[in-house]
């Protein structure tokens, strides 16, 4: 029973993501979500008290997916640049494989408590990486947020531009971007 409940909640979250990409966050209604998820409208209320609760849990899901993406194939025994490259590529490929997430990036910022969720995450992979690399004397003494904007955020920006401007980024160009964004945060 627990698995079925999790699957249905995931079905509702996937419908939320698709509907946001197609119609926008401000156009979401529980009725539209139910239709998109192929469930009865009342079924959604078995899982979520109201739209705000659904969207807040959805925000947690989106952020958790992003954190899991950073962790994928991460090996802290590798040199710092290799660790960085892995996180950068993880973000890039995650966004290539999840086009609705890419379409919804700006809208996620409008989700209830999304900014608070992002701020309150401590000891995530990126933070730990930054602290260890700073301790080793490799990274600039800037906050994790600033380091992220100068480095991993380039994967997000390029993925977004590649989708909407429709240009192809060859592997050697991506490698060059990874190397240059790494240099941007070095001491």
From Swiss-Prot:
Residues 6-66 form the HTH tetR-type domain. One of its GO terms (biological process) is regulation of DNA-templated transcription. The keyword Ion transport does not apply. Signal peptide: none annotated. Keywords: DNA-binding, Repeat, Transcription, Transcription regulation. Pfam families: TetR_HI_0893_C (PF22604), TetR_N (PF00440). The keyword Transcription applies. It comes from the Bacteria. Residues 29-48 bind DNA. GO terms for molecular function: DNA-binding transcription factor activity; transcription cis-regulatory region binding. PANTHER family: ACREF/ENVCD OPERON REPRESSOR-RELATED, ACREF_ENVCD OPERON REPRESSOR-RELATED. This is Uncharacterized HTH-type transcriptional regulator HI_0893. It comes from Haemophilus influenzae (strain ATCC 51907 / DSM 11121 / KW20 / Rd).
């Amino acid at each position: 029973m627990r698995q079925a409940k999790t699957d249905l909640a995931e079905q509702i979250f996937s419908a939320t993501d698709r509907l946001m990409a197609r119609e926008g966050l401000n156009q979401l209604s529980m009725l539209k979500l139910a239709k998109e998820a192929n469930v009865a409208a009342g079924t959604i209320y078995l899982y979520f008290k109201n739209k705000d609760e659904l969207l807040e849990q959805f925000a947690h899901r989106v952020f958790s997916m992003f954190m899991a993406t950073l962790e994928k194939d991460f090996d802290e025994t590798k040199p710092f640049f290799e660790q960085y490259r892995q996180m950068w590529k993880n973000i890039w490929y995650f966004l290539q494989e999840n086009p609705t997430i890419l379409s919804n990036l700006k809208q996620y910022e409008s989700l209830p408590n999304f900014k608070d969720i992002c701020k309150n995450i401590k000891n995530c992979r990126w933070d730990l990486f930054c602290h260890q690399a700073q301790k080793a004397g490799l990274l600039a003494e800037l906050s994790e947020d600033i380091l992220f904007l100068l480095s991993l955020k380039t994967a997000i920006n390029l993925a977004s531009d590649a989708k909407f401007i429709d240009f192809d980024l060859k592997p050697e160009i991506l490698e060059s971007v990874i190397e240059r964004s790494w240099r941007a945060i070095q001491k």
